[in-house]
């Protein structure tokens, strides 16, 4: 029996959440503002540093900070910063809590909080190779006597930026195109079948077919779904489909800390991934550290995300795009059209196009103009039909789900200024 006043893991998270929610938005928000005033002479730490802020009409992009953390999550992180705890125990408890929160997650699955989706990939692949064997964990990236090959589709590989995280554990990536290639490639060295969810349209083997190949040979399958929330259902859809490990970014649609992520999957593989990461040593993933504040922040952010009315949010995001479109329709030679990306950043988006005979602008010069203001406005020069250089393109793609209230008006004003400043 614990002594009075001793830390009790059973009620730590419940107490923490209740404290943060009960205090918000009054005392905690006031305290946060007071702390911000102490931290910044000007009212903005970025002004103090001379770093220009950005209005994010682009999306959950790591280059510009991903997403903004909610005040409730900040309050939970602040509370977590006030005590020391066992990181190993905190990871176990939050992982179990998250598995309970995701009610559709298969019964033999659990979760762990990671250092972003990239950390989930690196430690998840390592865990598949080593299990919880301390000698094998210590041996990485030397795979002598261990399985060493990861099968990946060529159509995914050509646009995928996270192969270094796969290879970090010493693996060799074997590229395939068609199911018959997979059958030929599988051998006694095959450790994993790897899938990049956003690239599903680019490969010949689709997401549901890929898992069937893994099951046929009893080989674990990993799916990188980093930016694939919303929709909420994606958080469990691929585990239910049969994927053994699924990675999500915490700092994108979930609006958790930018350096956090989620790894969901079979309990044995999730535990193995955790033992290949911080705070355990010696491990390949020792540098994949997530602090206690970020662990708690990721848990709280997910709790908030699951409680939100997603259809209402979609309507709000669409309304912001409608406002900008209405302002731009007043300009002769400018048009707008709506679409929703099929997988990653699956939220309302708008393509803004212009007639090059009326405006001396390309996608690249438009992005440069918007980025030159203070605050800058960030958009995407890509989208359906985009070229690599954007030198000849005449459109931008705008996303609204990272805009703060009222920023759509600034975006519309800046766009109108841009068009007026660049007549053909």
What are the functions of these language-model segments?
Residues 1-19:
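N-terminal secretory signal peptides and thylakoid transit peptides that target proteins
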Residues 302-326:
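Structural signature of PLP-dependent enzymes
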Residues 329-418:
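Conserved C-terminal alpha-helix-loop-beta "cap" of PLP-dependent enzymes
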Residues 13-16, 20, 37-55, 59-64, ...:
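Conserved PLP-enzyme active-site core in the AAT-like
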Residues 87-92, 107-111, 285-289, 308-317, ...:
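Flexible, glycine/charged-enriched surface loops at secondary-structure junctions
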Residues 63, 67-68, 74-75, 79-97:
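Metallocofactor- and cofactor-centric catalytic cores in central/energy metabolism, strongly enriched
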């Amino acid at each position: 029996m614990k002594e009075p006043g001793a830390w009790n893991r059973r009620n730590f998270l419940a107490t923490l959440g209740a404290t943060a929610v009960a205090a918000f938005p009054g005392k905690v928000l006031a305290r946060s503002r007071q702390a911000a005033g102490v931290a910044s002479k000007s009212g903005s730490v970025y002004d103090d540093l001379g770093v220009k802020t950005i209005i994010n009409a682009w999306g959950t992009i790591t280059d510009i900070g991903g997403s903004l953390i909610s005040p409730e999550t900040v309050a939970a992180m602040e509370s977590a910063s006030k005590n020391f705890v066992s990181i190993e125990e905190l990871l176990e408890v939050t992982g179990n809590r998250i598995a309970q929160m995701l009610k559709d997650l298969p019964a033999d699955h659990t979760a762990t909080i990671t250092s972003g989706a990239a950390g989930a990939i690196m430690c998840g692949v390592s865990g598949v190779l080593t299990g919880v064997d301390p000698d094998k964990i210590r041996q990485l990236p030397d795979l002598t006597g261990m399985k060493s090959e990861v099968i990946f589709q060529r159509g995914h590989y050509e646009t995928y930026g996270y192969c270094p995280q796969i290879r970090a554990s010493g693996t060799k990536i074997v590229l395939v195109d068609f199911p018959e290639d997979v059958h030929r490639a599988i051998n006694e060295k095959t450790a994993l079948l790897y899938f990049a969810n956003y690239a599903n349209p680019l490969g010949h083997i689709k997401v549901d077919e890929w898992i069937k190949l893994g099951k046929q040979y009893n080989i674990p399958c990993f799916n990188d779904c980093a930016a694939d929330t919303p929709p909420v259902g994606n958080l469990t859809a691929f585990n239910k489909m049969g994927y053994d490990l699924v990675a999500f970014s915490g700092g994108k649609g979930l609006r958790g800390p930018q350096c956090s992520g989620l790894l969901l999957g079979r309990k044995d593989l999730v535990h193995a991934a955790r033992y290949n990461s911080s705070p355990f040593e010696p491990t390949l993933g020792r540098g994949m550290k997530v602090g206690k504040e970020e662990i708690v922040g990721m848990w709280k952010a997910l709790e908030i995300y699951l409680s939100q009315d997603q259809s209402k949010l979609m309507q709000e995001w669409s309304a912001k795009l409608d406002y900008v479109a209405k302002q731009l329709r007043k300009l002769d030679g400018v048009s707008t059209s709506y679409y929703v990306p099929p997988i990653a950043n699956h939220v309302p988006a708008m393509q803004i196009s212009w007639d090059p005979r009326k405006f001396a602008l390309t996608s690249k010069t438009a992005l440069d103009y918007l980025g030159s203001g203070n605050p800058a406005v960030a958009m995407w020069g890509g989208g359906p039909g985009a070229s690599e250089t954007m030198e000849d393109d005449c459109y931008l793609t705008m996303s609204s789900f990272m805009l703060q209230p009222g920023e759509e008006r600034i975006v519309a004003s800046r766009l109108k200024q841009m068009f007026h400043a660049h007549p053909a």
